[in-house]
């Protein structure tokens, strides 16, 4: 069996950019076919030519489906053309298995989401650019509050039935909140008891199980616990992950389950746990319900964050050899980082000022009054203090150096950050949260002028001036500053040399 796996793997690698067999072809050959297959980056069957995902644009609410090119990689250029001059959200992630197990905006459950009627947020269509074999594609960047779900899935494991699953994730994008998951969950979006889930979890939560080091870890969300092994506590064999692209795999059958993982860009999978179910009531036998979740917990806990590129769920318990062949296929796809910024270039270390382009406000610049970030009328004849308040030093992004952070010229060590969706000026406290809140990515101005500046950690949200105060705003949403009227103008700023 292992020799066959090596043959399959070699074929995948030799095929280069046009992979002969996709992950689901490999699972099928191993006798554990995919019953759900989701990816915004590529086809997961060699013969799949249908839609990968759907995007909806903010300008007119129109939608379009993004399909793979002949290489199997998503047609990112079609998305870029459709979304030009506006914003786009990922509304559907299509199931490639033929079972119709598509993922859509998650409804409320035990926890409500931040959108109208308690629904979760949808992901930005541009928050997670990557390349596969040099071809651009977009992943699914899940900010807290974002989630997708299908509570009426077909063919997924129920009860104690055997299943497997894997996901390719961003190993650098995570948090300790509950719960960035992909996999099998409750059908009513509520916690129905121990053993009613079986999903991949990625993050550094320490509320339930843990692995070695400080995390993040690949664990299993089995409901009412994140498990790293048979104990509800620590499994020293479950390592902290530091790969940019990570393959995470979970599989389970009666009184047997496993955690496997590895670098999605090179090398093989390792087994972090393989053995009996947790020695806690409710997990042997399992009571899986068969819904599918992405980015959230089974009860719609939506505080987690992470990035998803591809993943599947299978019928039956895949062999290690089959999973090893799938890993070789993933490595052959050659995931790599892509630029997070576009439009007018910024130079780290330079001083800049940012002028509004909305017709009302073209003499106003982004400035601060104490900790409040606002717009003020500034000119070359303004007082020195005001010119300093309206000048910002460009720094490499504190959370991601492919983007930027903006340090105050007159308050050294203080940066623009978002807090409760408002922009404020705070001293850098060195925390992971501060770094993420203070990291922003530039793109060509949505209204055609200058630059628009989106939050790295909430890429649906942009610097916006609203009643002269600065927010991170989405193009339509539940907050007054998310209003669609004048959005494109309000989020576009002309960058110039700093006043000071």
Swiss-Prot record:
SUPFAM superfamilies the record matches: AbfB domain (SSF110221), Concanavalin A-like lectins/glucanases (SSF49899)
E.C. designation(s): 3.2.1.55, 3.2.1.37
Highest taxon of the lineage: Eukaryota
Gene3D superfamilies linked to this entry: 2.60.120.200, 2.80.10.50
UniProt source species: Trichoderma koningii
Pfam entry (one): AbfB
Glycosylation sites: 467
Catalytic activity: Hydrolysis of terminal non-reducing alpha-L-arabinofuranoside residues in alpha-L-arabinosides; Hydrolysis of (1->4)-beta-D-xylans, to remove successive D-xylose residues from the non-reducing termini
Record's protein name: Arabinofuranosidase/B-xylosidase
Alphabetically ordered keywords of this record: Carbohydrate metabolism, Glycoprotein, Glycosidase, Hydrolase, Multifunctional enzyme, Polysaccharide degradation, Signal, Xylan degradation
GO biological process: arabinan metabolic process; L-arabinose metabolic process; pectin catabolic process; xylan catabolic process
